Amino acid sequence: MNQRLQAESLLRVFVRGQLASFYWGQFASSLVDLGLSSDKNVNVRVETKGSSTRLWVSPQRGSENYVAIVHFNGSKLVRRQCRGITPVSADHKAAVCPEGWKAFEIPEV
């Protein structure tokens, strides 16, 4: 459970950081650009392409993986957090969870 809370915390600050970064002109391309770092017990990857950015979080223990998505749809920023255990394809659609993954809300603290 602690692993899930850590992943959700990282997703939360990533989304907040990307919302602010986009306000100033563009999405950040790394956690370092956002002033963030991750725990050594998780593998993280930031993907930024055009109007979307994603943070993939894969804890080294367990099979649950996470992704935070921030997407500009032309009029507003859309955000989504997802978790799942199945591998995902490289074909991602805007602000949609990977196939077989579940969207979830991260409570604000």
Model-assigned labels for residue ranges:
Residues 1-22:
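Amphipathic alpha-helical segments typified by the pilin-like N-terminal helix
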Residues 23-109:
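Periplasmic/extracellular, small/polar-rich flexible segments of pilin-like filament-forming proteins
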